[in-house]
Amino acid sequence: MPTIVSNNEVKKVPNIKPLNTGPLNKIQFSNIIFPFGRTFGPKIFGELAQKLSEYSPNNNGIKIPVPGEGLPRVINYCADQSGCAFWRMIWPGDELLANNRAVIMTLYQMVTLGQFYGGIDAVRLQRQCTEPQLEFIKFLRNVSDQMKQQTGKGFRIIWEVDDIVCPAVDIPDYNVCKTAFEGDTVYNNVKEMMKYVDEATVVSEHMRQHYKKHLGFDKITVIPNYAPKSWIDRGYDEKQLRRKYNRKGKPRVLYAGSGTHFDVTNKTGQKDDFGHVVDAIIKDITIDKKYDWVFFGALPMKLKQFIGKGIEFHPWCSILDYPQKLREMDVDVSIAPLQNNAFSRSKANIKLTEAGMQGIPCVAQNIDCYNSDGWKYLFDTAEEMFKKVDQILRTENSYMEACKFAREYSEKFLLQDHLDEYTLLYTTDYGDIKRKENASFLKNNPEQFV
């Protein structure tokens, strides 16, 4: 966001050294023009608003507010550019910006210029676990503390994670990403980081309990994965759903997911998230032939031989196209098997909401990530999975009931309805009474207010 200042004012900005290159107790922050048009000292938003009004040819004496005036100001540091970053960092930031609820800057490159953080309310860092990232968090703590000492206001430092990254023993061996987190270094780095952050955010209560136990850190807040309506909502058409149910041919059953769910290197002998259901699927493909199977993104190694022979496979696509692709596949039901382990139990519920917003009911594993919020189509064994699919598809009425349930459940997780949870995260301390006044924040984090 540009800052409108005169040339004379720009010349008045002193040549200040970065915080990491000079004596911290000698650095003056007053009268420095900071990012996002914010200043300490005599330069305040009211003056900038006045200047903007002077540039308007038809203001008739009415003050024109600076975009973002008085809003929380946040810097996001992302660890990836895939789904994790979009769900946890990019989409919330974009939605807050678009609705004029906060001013968010999303970055990947670490910025070690102290003045850059002037006027910031919070810095949120995604899945930081390396030694350089630890040093960066120490730097941020130092900058925030010095700003608070000199100006009365620092910024909050928030560590964000949406998966189990430590201890490595709790990452399944079949997950090909495990090698990046093995050994003691990552675990020790993350434990050390907790000494310097104000709060951590996770996707689920089970994940909160996991990190509380293993990191010895209590200030952990649950913010579920909320989806932007503009991305996930492609409409809900009951006539189309009825047409799909009554079409000729076998019902179409979908699995959509990444290769991290499968033993792609054969490290565990195919004992992965599909280990308990894959043989039953093969039996249906080769003998019973009751369903058509659709896999989107990846599939178990045992099923590769059936591509084009009972299995329809679609490679991964741009995340922007993902909801529309789900609709175009014209599937009736989706499934979400998981191995019952700490990693799986801590997951978010996006398998339910991604399909559910399209009116596609999901038959999901009966573990914490899916059974803790009222979802009713659950299974433990392969036999139960098939029974639940049959139950949904038994009649047109049972199918429409399941589609409606899936849609209504998913609508509870639209990002536009949960922006206050993010602004509270950025502007209030852990356990602040203002958080308790937000019904969703209280529901997901009752322990903060005990």
What function would you assign to each model-found segment?
Residues N15, I158-Y187, S230, G235, ...:
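Acceptor-binding helix/loop patch of EC 2.4 sugar-transfer enzymes
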